[in-house]
């Protein structure tokens, strides 16, 4: 028999809803079906693993529709005990579960992406800081070496300029002025002495001439 012909429909009653919590489901099955066929059909359609199946025959019953009377079809009631998996009888519940699963997957993917972005940003920041530290450590050495070269080249001209400044300092100028004034005074004194000597000689010559007369 075909799998779709074996299982007709699920039986939904208060008892069946209670048994669903215990992973036991009730189905209306073709009266010609056997337990092995029912087990194969349920495992194939719902993708679950069946532990055991209990069958009960449901005979025909009288049914009145308006003025007419008739009989219902006879069938078998199958109590299916599942070992693994669950059977979603209502398609709306399946769609809801699928939507919830998709939302959870999206949330997980977004959260994972955010975490990956944060980790990548932290790693990039660490790498940049390490590169900056290496640059900062290498730059002062180069600067100090350049400074040393510059100072070694420019030391001698700086000393020469200072010597020139010392020669032209105002203190030395005043000392030079003082020496020149002293020399002038000395020359004046010598000149005065010479004039005095000439005068004395002239007076002595005059006196000698007068005595001879």
Curated annotation (Swiss-Prot):
Question: Which key words are in the record?
Answer: Ribonucleoprotein, Ribosomal protein, RNA-binding, rRNA-binding
Which Pfam families does the record cross-reference, listed alphabetically?
Ribosomal_L23
Coiled-coil annotation reads none
Region (Unknown): which ranges? 118-213
Asked if the record carries the keyword Ribosomal protein, the reply is yes
Role description:
One of the early assembly proteins it binds 23S rRNA. One of the proteins that surrounds the polypeptide exit tunnel on the outside of the ribosome. Forms the main docking site for trigger factor binding to the ribosome.
PANTHER family given for it? 60S RIBOSOMAL PROTEIN L23A
| Family to which this protein belongs | Belongs to the universal ribosomal protein uL23 family.
Quaternary arrangement and interactors, per the entry? Part of the 50S ribosomal subunit. Contacts protein L29, and trigger factor when it is bound to the ribosome.
Name of the protein in its database record: Large ribosomal subunit protein uL23
Per the UniProt entry, what species is this protein from, by scientific name? Mycoplasma mobile (strain ATCC 43663 / 163K / NCTC 11711)
């Amino acid at each position: 028999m075909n799998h779709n012909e074996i299982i007709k429909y699920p039986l939904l009653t208060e008892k069946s809803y209670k048994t669903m919590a215990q992973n036991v489901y009730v189905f209306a099955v073709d009266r010609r079906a056997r337990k092995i066929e029912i087990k194969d059909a349920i495992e194939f359609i719902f993708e679950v693993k069946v532990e055991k199946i209990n069958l009960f025959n449901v005979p025909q019953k009288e049914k009145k529709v308006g003025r007419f009377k008739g009989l219902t079809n006879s069938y078998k009631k199958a109590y299916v005990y599942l070992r693994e998996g669950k059977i979603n009888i209502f398609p709306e519940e399946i769609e809801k579960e699928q939507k919830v699963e998709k939302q959870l997957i999206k949330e997980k993917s977004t959260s994972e992406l955010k975490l990956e972005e944060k980790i990548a940003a932290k790693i990039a920041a660490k790498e940049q800081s390490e590169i900056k530290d290496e640059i900062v450590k290498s730059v002062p050495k180069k600067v100090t070496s350049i400074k040393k070269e510059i100072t070694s080249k420019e030391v001698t001209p700086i000393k020469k300029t200072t010597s020139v400044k010392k020669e032209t300092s105002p203190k030395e100028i005043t000392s030079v002025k003082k020496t020149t004034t002293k020399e002038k005074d000395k020359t004046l004194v010598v000149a005065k002495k010479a004039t005095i000597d000439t005068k004395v000689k002239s007076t002595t010559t005059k006196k000698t001439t007068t005595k001879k007369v």
